[in-house]
């Protein structure tokens, strides 16, 4: 193709990007019959510090190298990543690029092809997802410039929760606030959608029944699935609500914010930094936002942070089980959920009354 990557009838490669604040994760897929087969997965990590490119093909490492001793910005990292992917495609034509976008509000309920006008609309949600949305959109913007003939498709974390009943979406505020978009949206929807898609192959009864999914990573949330559809989740208007996270508070009495403003004299920006970057496991422990560090530590504040995390997860489990009217299955996913059996055990141990 004269424009390099324009879609044609023979286009058979897809790239998927998840651009975050300190890393850009990617996968490539090849068309295989009526489905897709993943070929590569990897990431550029350490943005802002020591960037590193790692990638695997079918589970076997094919690259692991430091990119720069002086740091890279997102644009430079994406250019390096794009060059690497093109080389690994060995001449295959790129059919499209998929992007994780955290917030789509009420107007984006399904995967959407992005152009400049759509980007402008998505930018309205940056204040509601300041840790993620700017980086998601920056990656799309760059790909539109680098690959002008290739569709850029945004897939939204909020979209999966469109099935949540209105009573679970609304805050107890006058209707004008809901009309302005102040409601509970929920996040991590792409993760929950994947769980819902594979659960039938693991347990048909659970997939058709009542499941609580724990997405426990640096960002943490839970969702109640009824027959694979979301009916409730712990995150809300923003990705702060719900469980304590690596550096985020989780749910907080709004009166605490009033106290910070009125009595402590904190500014909006100071409170924002506290809520998003200085709280959660890091704030409680004074040590680390990484659950692995806390579990390895004998320090009392580290143990307390783990205790609070597990307690809040158990409490939310009870709440979501009540919304479901019972419980048939529990699923754990994401970094902590998949790799920390001690956390899984501590959450489940005190949930025996639910049949766990």
Model-inferred region functions:
Residues 273, 280-284, 291-323:
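Adenine-nucleotide phosphate-binding core of ATP-dependent small-molecule kinases
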Residues 328-346, 350:
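Glycine-rich phosphate-binding loops at beta-strand->alpha-helix junctions
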Residues 14-16, 23-71:
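Short glycine-rich, Thr/Ser-proximal phosphate-binding strand/loop in the N-terminal lobe
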Residues 160-261:
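Glycine-rich phosphate-binding loop of actin/hexokinase-like ATP-binding domains
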Residues 253-256, 260-287:
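Oxyanion-binding "anion nests"
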């Amino acid at each position: 193709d004269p424009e390099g990557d324009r879609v044609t009838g023979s286009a058979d490669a897809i790239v998927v990007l998840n651009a975050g604040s300190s890393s850009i994760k990617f996968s490539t897929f090849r068309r295989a019959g009526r489905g897709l087969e993943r070929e590569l997965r990897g990431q550029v990590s350490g943005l802002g510090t020591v960037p590193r490119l790692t990638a695997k093909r079918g589970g076997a490492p094919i690259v692991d190298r430091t990119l720069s001793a002086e740091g890279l910005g997102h644009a430079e990292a994406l250019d390096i990543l794009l060059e690497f992917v093109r080389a690994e495609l060995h001449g295959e034509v790129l059919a499209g690029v998929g992007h994780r976008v955290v917030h789509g509000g009420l107007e984006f309920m399904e995967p959407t092809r992005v152009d400049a006008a759509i980007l402008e609309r998505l930018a309205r949600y940056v204040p509601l997802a300041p840790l993620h949305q700017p980086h998601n959109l920056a990656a799309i913007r760059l790909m539109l410039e680098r690959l002008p003939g290739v569709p850029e498709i945004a897939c939204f974390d909020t979209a999966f929760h469109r099935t949540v009943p209105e009573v679970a979406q609304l805050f107890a505020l006058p209707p004008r606030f809901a009309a302005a978009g102040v409601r509970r949206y929920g996040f991590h929807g792409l993760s929950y959608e994947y769980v819902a898609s594979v659960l039938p192959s693991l347990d048909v009864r659970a997939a058709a029944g009542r499941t609580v999914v724990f997405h426990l990573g640096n960002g943490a949330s839970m969702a109640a699935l009824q027959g694979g559809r979301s009916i409730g989740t712990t995150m809300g208007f923003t990705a702060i609500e719900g469980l304590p996270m690596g550096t985020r508070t989780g749910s907080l009495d709004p009166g605490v914010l009033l106290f910070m403003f009125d009595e402590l004299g904190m500014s909006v920006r100071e409170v924002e930094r506290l809520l998003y970057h200085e709280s959660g496991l890091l704030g409680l422990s004074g040590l680390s936002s990484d659950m692995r560090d806390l579990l390895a530590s004998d320090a009392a504040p580290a143990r307390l942070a783990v205790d609070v995390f597990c307690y809040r997860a158990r409490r939310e489990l009870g709440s979501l089980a009540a919304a479901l009217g019972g419980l048939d299955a529990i699923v754990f996913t994401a970094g902590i959920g998949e790799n920390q059996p001690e956390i899984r055990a501590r959450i489940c141990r005190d949930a025996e009354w639910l049949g766990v």
